Structure formats: C-alpha cells, structure tokens
Amino acid sequence: MIAVSFKCRCQILRRLTKDESPYTKSASQTKPPDGALAVRRQSIPEEFKGSTVVELMKKEGTTLGLTVSGGIDKDGKPRVSNLRQGGIAARSDQLDVGDYIKAVNGINLAKFRHDEIISLLKNVGERVVLEVEYELPPVSIQGSSVMFRTVEVTLHKEGNTFGFVIRGGAHDDRNKSRPVVITCVRPGGPADREGTIKPGDRLLSVDGIRLLGTTHAEAMSILKQCGQEATLLIEYDVSVMDSVATASGPLLVEVAKTPGASLGVALTTSVCCNKQVIVIDKIKSASIADRCGALHVGDHILSIDGTSMEYCTLAEATQFLANTTDQVKLEILPHHQTRLALKGPDHVKIQRSDRQLPWDPWASSQCSVHTNHHHNPHHPDHCRVPALGFPKALTPNSPPAMVSSSSPTSMSAYSLSSLNMGTLPRSLYSTSPRGTMMRRRLKKKDFKSSLSLASSTVGLAGQVVHTETTEVVLTADPVTGFGIQLQGSVFATETLSSPPLISYIEADSPAERCGVLQIGDRVMAINGIPTEDSTFEEANQLLRDSSITSKVTLEIEFDVAESVIPSSGTFHVKLPKKHSVELGITISSPSSRKPGDPLVISDIKKGSVAHRTGTLELGDKLLAIDNIRLDSCSMEDAVQILQQCEDLVKLKIRKDEDNSDEQESSGAIIYTVELKRYGGPLGITISGTEEPFDPIIISSLTKGGLAERTGAIHIGDRILAINSSSLKGKPLSEAIHLLQMAGETVTLKIKKQTDAQPASSPKKLPIPSHSSDLGDGEEDPSPIQRPGKLSDVYPSTVPSVDSAVDSWDGSGIDARYGSQGTTFQTSGYNFNTYDWRSPKKRASLSPVPKPRSQTYPDVGLSNEDWDRSTASGFAGASDSADAEQEENFWSQALEDLETCGQSGILRELEATIMSGSTMSLNHEAPTARSQLGRQASFQERSNSRPHYSQTTRSNTLPSDVGRKSVTLRKMKQEIKEIMSPTPVELHKVTLYKDSGMEDFGFSVADGLLEKGVYVKNIRPAGPGDLGGLKPYDRLLQVNHVRTRDFDCCLVVPLIAESGNKLDLVISRNPLASQKSIEQPALPSDWSEQNSAFFQQPSHGGNLETREPTNTL
C-alpha cells in the first residue's frame, strides 16, 4: 500500500504540464494515472457510492485549478481528472481525482455537454458549490496479513486545512458506513511535510474528539473548527510476516520509498560473538520501516544496498542509510525476540540471503522465501497468503522457513481496534476523559480532591483505585522527541477544568523507556507550571518549549489499584512487560543470605507497572520468576531471567512480615510521635547497618533530652518512618540524613516490636544498667554470652499486664519465649520458650537452636516448673477467634493513648514490660483464685456465666503462695528505678445492661480541663459498679469505636445503640479513683437522667473487680 501511495505522488508531480484550458482535458490525459483511486469511465456502483458538498471561493478572473472530463456528448459523467498543484481546488483538500461532479451551484450536470460544463465553471461567480459523488474507500480488515496500530500526529494548519482529503464516515445505510479514511495527502502540504500520514490511514480523533460514528460532513466540520494546531489520532496498517519470525538465518529485505524520505530507523552498535555489529536501535511509529513489518528493534544490519557493515562505524552506517534511493536493500539477521508476523505487501520483498555466518547453524541450508502480493482494487490492504513449497534439502529437524497462518478471525472496518479496551496498550477508548464514568465523576468534583491517597475511586472496568503523584524527567530523543501526546479539552483555547491526559506514548521513546508513564495519566504540571486552569494550547506550548532544551519535568497523577494483598503466605503476581521497558522492581541479595533463602524486592519504582498493581511492597520475598525457582540462583541470574521474560511476567511472592496490615497479630504497636526541637537536639541515638532491610533502632536516649521527656520513645524502639518518609529498605546512612534534614518539627513513626533479634544481625545494642541482668535465655545465660539488645530481653509490644489489662488467654498473642524446649498451649496458640513471634512469621525464621533444658535466668524456673504451671494454669481454654479481636483491640487502645496525649500511660506500659511482668502468662495455680495473681478482671469469653469476685494482681509467674524468689525482689527494684511516677492504668470492661433499670449504671460528662468523656456518677450495685468502673475513668473506646476526641453528644448515642452488651476501654488515675471511693455514696434516687447505661446482672455469677496495686 505504501508503494502505491508513493507512485500516486510521483505521477501527480509528473503531470504538472499546463493545460490549454483550465477546465478542459487534453488528449494525452485521457488515460487515468497509474495507481489513482477508482478512476473509471462508468458510474460508481450504488453500494460503493458516497456524496459530499464542496464549497470553493475564487476571485474574479481566476480559475479553480481543476480539470474536468466527461459530459453527455462524451463517454461518461463529468468527473475530476486532474487537480493543478497550488490551485484553489487542490488547496481546499476536499476534492480528489476521480470524483464525479453531480451539480454546480444547484444546476444538475446530467444533461450538459462537455463544453457547457466548462463554460458553466468559468462563469459561475466567486462562490462555487459542487455536489460531488465519490467511491467509498475500501474496508480495511485486520486479519491474517495486516495488523492495526495507532499514532498521534500534531499538525499545524495551512490556510484552513491540514493537507489531506478525508472520505467515508457514518451513513444511514450500514453497508456504506466507513471509518473516516484519509484518501489523499497533498504533496507539499502540512501532513506531507510531517511525513507520518499516508493514504489509507484512518482518522480516529481530532484533539480528543472521537470521530467514530460521525458523518463525513461532521468530520469535516470538526477539522475546520479546531485550532491552528491539532493533535490527530491516526490508525494505520502494519504488514506482518511469517518469514521474518521463522527465519533461521540472514534475510534480504527490499523496501520501496520515496527518494529523500526517511526510512524511520535509528541505528546503534552492539557486540555479538565478540564482534561489533550494527543493530536497529529505534523504529519511528508509522514510518516506512514500521509499516513494512519486516524490520524490528534489535535486528542486525549486515549490509545496506550491498555494502557490508562488518567494518563500518555507526556514523558511516547511518550515512549509508540516509543516502539510499527509492529501493532500499537491507541484509538483516532478525532478532531472536522478533514478534510473530504474517505476510507483507508487494513493495517489501524478502528472500533468504546467501551470506553465511559462523554462528548461524542453518547457514548451509539454501532456502529462499518469496512473498507474492495480490492487490485488490476494492481492498488494497488485504493480502492473501500464498502456498509455499519448501526444498527437500531441509531436514525434518530443521525449522521451517515460514509458517502459513490463515486465521479466519478478522475485524470489520467499523469495529476499530481502538474499541478493544484493555487489549491494546494504545487504546483510544480508555484515554478519553469523557469515555468512562470515572472521568465524568472527576470532572464534576474538584479535581484536587483526588490527590488524597485516602480517597479511593472507581477506575476502568469498575476497579477500585487510589491516585498518587510522581515527578518524571524526560530527555528528548533526536528521532522520537519526548514521545508523548496530550489530550485535553474540545477546543485548544478552552480553559482546562481538569489536567490534560497522556493519550499516546510512542514506542521506544524516552516516555516509554522511563517505565513510569502510561496512557491515561494526568499531567498536573510541566516544568513546575500547573496545567489546570490553563488552556490545552498552553500545555502543548510548554512541551514544545521544552524540546528546545531537550529536557522536560512532568508531574503526573496516576491510578494505583486497591488490590487485595495477602497478609502472609505466598501468592502470584502477573505483570505486563514491554521490550526495553523495565518492570520497576529492584531485587537484592542480603549479605546474610544462605543457600535456599529467597531474594528480596529492595525497591519499587513509583509509577512503574509493579507499583501500579498495588500488590508488591518493599521487603517482599521473590521466590520464582515464570515458574523458575530462585532459591539457588544468584542475583545476577535472577536479573537475567527477568530481562528475558516476554509479554507477561509471573512472579511468585512471599509476603514480608513487616508488610502485614495486621501488625497486632504479632503484638506490634505502631504509633507516631511529633517532636518540636526549637533549635535544640532531639536527644536520640540510632543504630543499624547499611543492609537495606536491617531495622533502624533507637539505641540510646539523652538523659532529660527532648525524646526522653515525651515518655513515648524508648531504647529498643524501631523507627519506621521519619517525616512520612519510610525507612523500609533504607540503610542507616539514609536515616541519619533524613534526621539531619528534618527541620524544626520531626515526626517519627515508632514500632514497639516483639520480634527477637535475628540471628544474622551483626549488631547488638547496649542496654541500660537497670536491665543488664535480663538475659535472652536462648543461649548460655552467662554475662559474656548474653545479647545486649533490649528487644531480646522482653517483647516490648506485648500489652501491659497490670490490673487493667486482660489475661493472656484473652490477648490472643502467639508468643514463644525463652529457650526452645517445652511448648505451652492455650487458647489455640502456642507459647514456646524460644522467642515471641506470630504464627505468620515462623515460616521465615532462620533455623532455631537445639533444645536446651536450662532455667530462665530471671525467673529461675526449669522446664519442669513450666510444665507443672501449665498443667494447672492452662486448663481453661478460650475461643481463638476472640483472641484475634483482642489483639487488635489492645493495639488500637495503646495508639489512642499516644495520640490523645497520655504518653504517661505508654511509659507505664513500658515500665511494666521492663519489670518482667510480661512473663506472667496467666497461669492459674491449683489453689484458690484469691491467693493467685490475675492480670485481668473480665473474662467475657468464658462459656459459663460471668462471675463477680475480687482478686489482686501479682507480677510473678503463677505459682503457689509460698513461691517467692530472688527474681521478684529484682523486679520490684527495677520497677522503682524505671517506672514513671505518673499513676495511670488501662482497663477493658465489659458490662451487661441491668434488666430491671434498663441501664448500665453510670453517667458520663465532658472533661473540664482536658478534652474527652469521663465517668461521672456510678449507681451502687449497678452493672458499672459491679464491673469495676470508678468516677473520673476516661472512655477511650466504646464498642471498639475510638472516642478519644469525642464529647458526650457523640458518646451517649454509641452507648445507647450498644444493646445489652457494652465493651469499654478506659484509662484511670488510681489516685483520683481512691479519692472517689472516700466520697459518700450517691442518693438512692439516682436515675437514668445522668446518661446511665450498662450490663445485666441477670447473667448471674461474679464479675471480678480490680484492685489496682501497681501505681506507677
């Protein structure tokens, strides 16, 4: 088809002889030019006939510049046989050679003689209206020989046209409906000078206005009304060839082109078999090389027009290619990743080269492949695949030179490929800002609201997404430029109400190679200048200005899928991959990696394909690529496997424990602390390593410093983020840099973790003197071998075990503690004496030490003692489903304490943990409850009815009353040294409504000096009183709803809607509670008017009250 179009152009140029009369046809022009579209003497068949109205304006004394033949006295209807270059008719871009003129200014020419028609056209006046009939363009079918592609072209108007003629469009008769087809490109016009558009291309949109379903007249009107610069989306045909894909050696490719026209190929050098070779680096979209289908990126160029490239430099090869004539002969060695192709048209001849290469295993086979193209005048794009015969010299094991494919599947002309949303990467439908419901919603609301990561919206195909922004710097390419086209409002001068979209990305351009930009992304700013509230023309001008400096900085907004991410275990992720475009993930091998350990995803490029899935996170373990296991592969092998993947990459991932959304399942507490330094130091020392995924730990605090005074930061805490910049995958040096650059206000995201120190970690943190006697219990407890990291000594994220905290069988935390040996089971969870870890994390633990039957250094209990305690203390099992709810419950409560300013409670919790009370695993001794320590008052998950009794709390391991050891004295001493003087407790209370009074037996009031809701009055013997509530208790949660910032107006409805059961989390100042006890009892007429509510005594039993004995 390309050869045909070029022949047309040459013939037109050769026919620039001056006619004797501007409207007469010379005898030498009786024969239509070779290759002209449907020039016939007879009428056009009705099913192929289209019509249009052409309006021309001419000055007095000038001619239209067209030659008309035919008439009633001639051999056919009046038709246009020639258009003079530069004439009015030619520059109008509305007429084409072969069009039939039906009427002039309403005068029907059916019965006019030839000389009468000429006379009418001469004397018609300044305004000429022609009714024209033309042959509809042929149907372009995407089938076995042709595939469709799209490209965006930006053209500047010349006069009021772009230098091409369009035909087709929608019609009332479906058989006459066609896409809008470009049938002629005027030589020397804007489209011809730009060089991309060729006759036969389909025009899909103009400045984002889709032309599908528009009539010819409507399409012409849109072209006229657009601005002086317009962006056109063009669909073109690409020939595809089996002979290239199945070639076993060098091929000779002949491509026809106009002399002086560029082939559209950029070359580079590469090394193959220790020799420098010339290869195709880039192919411009819609260029001659792209349309022919025989050349691909990566092909080796062996010769150009017979000149060998073996000893040529890159500059010489480029010059040879530029000097080629109308027939380019290239000898190529196809790249091994050449895409599957079909047959090509007759202007591309492919045959086997005689050149034998030392690395070519089929060099001795003499096989030639000839492609015959049969041209159909009605369907010039359609190619038939000829039958091929193969020489007998080919052995049965040799690959065939060509694979014939005659797939019956094809697409009609009006089922454009651009409508297959999600199939083609350059889909027009998905890029239109008005093509989806999502875009319409974004246009109705303030667009800036979508910048919030917390606001999810519905994207294409109904997928839930959230938006993110990133900055991209592009460096222009000499051939393709930046390689992006924008799509904005209907008119170029219209102010944009939403940012322009990226509607097209050119293949192998800087925009595609960066791996970040995708079609449909919103361009928020260009070189720092916001695009919103500006015009589309201004946005395009910014891009054009950037091409002068060959560099542009884009701020883009894109969609990230809200994927369902497994919190543990393994799963598969499939990512689409393009040639020369990275997936956006960086893999690394930890220095402590052992044989069989997986590789780790150490970085994910923002905006990349991997990032947009919303599934992958830093630290995830990469187990396999395309079902190739990586446990025995080096990092270099894995990178090579990743680079060799085609089209779709399948990754097998194991989730990193730190990426789990349910941190509470491991007892982790994560909260944020804001420090205002006011020019002074923070007073913290951090330690870590340069390994990306080693934790950054607070190793020491300056005495009386800013961090220590907050009461929320402690030695051994892990820093997750600094000023919202995550430290995930970052070394110690980067964390130090972030702290140095943090400014006056520093926000730290802290994690109190229960994880034991990894065996592979090379560093241990020093611990304060007051805890130096606390050992790990993992190895010999001698002082020399004791690890020094504080988190090894105690799990600092375990909920507080004072009288306010629920029992261990209610906390639902899977804990493994001490030396590996005896395993204790309760509530469906294992208490192992190795370390504290979640069940999700066990699979990734390094091999544990051999079991040792030794005593715990601080407790003095052997495995036998643990067993004896287990036999008596773990008899009552509880529901494990409630356990998971409990762990979420406590973590939220602790976070509430931090965010509401009660950092003293956190200090109390820390001190309780450091005191060693975390070893109290709620073992119940065989003796009476009143003699044993309990950590919680409310056992609401028991299948029996609640019981009301009173107990006191003990900081020792469950045992009989006589078991007092040196450990207890040590713990008490540590409590005196460590614990904060702030008296505060944390309680969880479950109440059942009084069936008689229909309330919970207490009233609430707003705080006077501090924001919050507090217990005011308590009815004696009511559910609140029996449940242990006291005046001045602060309500942190009501039925798992955080109420730290609520007032009574919001809390009272929550309590009223709770039904018969009410779950509360309260904080208590024991001193205030003791004062309230001394106050006289309330009068007997205490009523519901004090906002009283809570639990039924009809459930019977004894609900325990807590006697706070541990004031901090």
Curated annotation (Swiss-Prot):
Gene giving rise to this polypeptide: Grip1
Domain remarks in the Swiss-Prot or TrEMBL record: PDZ 6 mediates interaction with the PDZ recognition motif of EFNB1 and EPHB2 and with the C-terminus of PPFIA1 and PPFIA4. PDZ 4 and PDZ 5 mediate interaction with PRLHR. PDZ 4 and PDZ 5 mediate interaction with the C-terminus of GRIA2 and GRIA3. PDZ 4, PDZ 5 and PDZ 6 mediate homomultimers. PDZ 7 mediates interaction with PDZ domain of GRASP1. PDZ 7 domain binds CSPG4. PDZ 6 mediates interaction with the C-terminus of liprins-alpha. PDZ 1, PDZ 2 and PDZ 3 mediate interaction with the PDZ-binding motif of FRAS1.
Residue ranges with Polar residues bias: 928-958, 1086-1099
PANTHER family: GLUTAMATE RECEPTOR-INTERACTING PROTEIN 1, GLUTAMATE RECEPTOR-INTERACTING PROTEIN GRIP
Protein name as annotated: Glutamate receptor-interacting protein 1
Gene Ontology CC annotations of this record: dendrite; dendritic shaft; dendritic spine; dendritic spine head; dendritic spine neck; endoplasmic reticulum membrane; exocyst; GABA-ergic synapse
Membrane topology value: Peripheral membrane protein
Recorded superkingdom: Eukaryota
Keywords: Cell membrane, Cell projection, Cytoplasm, Cytoplasmic vesicle, Endoplasmic reticulum, Membrane, Phosphoprotein, Postsynaptic cell membrane, Repeat, Synapse
CDD domains named in the record: PDZ1_GRIP1-2-like, PDZ2_GRIP1-2-like, PDZ3_GRIP1-2-like, PDZ4_GRIP1-2-like, PDZ5_GRIP1-2-like, PDZ6_GRIP1-2-like, PDZ7_GRIP1-2-like
